Amino acid sequence: MEWFEALILGLIQGLTEYLPVSSSGHLAIGSALFGIEGEENLAFTIVVHVATVFSTLVILWKEIDWIFRGLFKFEMNSETRYVINILISMIPIGIVGVFFKDEVEAIFGSGLLIVGCMLLLTAALLSFSYYAKPRQKENISMKDAFIIGLAQACAVLPGLSRSGSTIATGLLLGDNKAKLAQFSFLMVIPPILGEALLDGMKMIKGEAIAGDIPTLSLIVGFIAAFVSGCLACKWMINIVKKGKLIYFAIYCAIVGVVTIVVSQLQ
């Protein structure tokens, strides 16, 4: 992987991790364009995912600081309930990761057709949430957290946007837009770090291929993903507040159709 390829893929990861257009789907498309095999860029994937975690920590640091300050009061307060909701939201993705990891990895290797189909599904979900007008709720309940977690678990499929699925689901449930966007970005931190840790351990044990990627490419990819992630995270929170997700539905529909056509021509 050349440094300019790492730059482009890092930018793609940083932007699409937060924008509701599927980071996994766009990385699959970008890797296919550059001729990069999925098994050969595991180290790069870990690096750019960790970079987006740092982006979240930077942009949402005030919220994270608020959570920890309240959590260490060791009492049942709003901060503790927030953490409980995040833990509840992790249950579905944890089950998928433990029991269905091999099946998910097999789907990732199935080509661009599944990516295109899932992008169309993302477009449909975003459109539905845009036109639906449920009554707004002030706080995210435990039940809502679990349902949003189910949406996150489904979004392990390449092309089905994680942020799009979780935010659209929360909007359909009537959750507060600003709080929903923040919750969506915070709830993904533990799963990303957990997956990165497991993949890193596999590389150390020799159970997975790290890929012969130059250090410069890893550094460039990390910086690109971090910077673009910071911009996208802040931008996306404002987009959700203003209710402008329909534009991303149109984008996903167009890219989905093009991806399906290209997959059939290969």
Swiss-Prot record:
InterPro entries: UppP
Family per similarity comment: Belongs to the UppP family.
GO molecular function: undecaprenyl-diphosphatase activity
Membrane-spanning ranges: 41-61, 82-102, 106-126, 140-160, 180-200, 213-233, 245-265
Note: Bacitracin is thought to be involved in the inhibition of peptidoglycan synthesis by sequestering undecaprenyl diphosphate, thereby reducing the pool of lipid carrier available.
Enzyme class: hydrolase
Pfam families the UniProt entry points to: BacA
Reactions catalysed, as given in the entry: di-trans,octa-cis-undecaprenyl diphosphate + H2O = di-trans,octa-cis-undecaprenyl phosphate + phosphate + H(+)
Record's bilayer topology term: Multi-pass membrane protein
The protein's name in its UniProt record: Undecaprenyl-diphosphatase
GO CC annotation terms, alphabetical: plasma membrane
Keyword Membrane listed: yes
Keywords: Antibiotic resistance, Cell inner membrane, Cell membrane, Cell shape, Cell wall biogenesis/degradation, Hydrolase, Membrane, Peptidoglycan synthesis, Transmembrane, Transmembrane helix
Function: Catalyzes the dephosphorylation of undecaprenyl diphosphate (UPP). Confers resistance to bacitracin.
EC number: 3.6.1.27
Originating organism: Bacteroides fragilis (strain ATCC 25285 / DSM 2151 / CCUG 4856 / JCM 11019 / LMG 10263 / NCTC 9343 / Onslow / VPI 2553 / EN-2)
Subcellular location(s) per record: Cell inner membrane
Example GO BP: cell wall organization
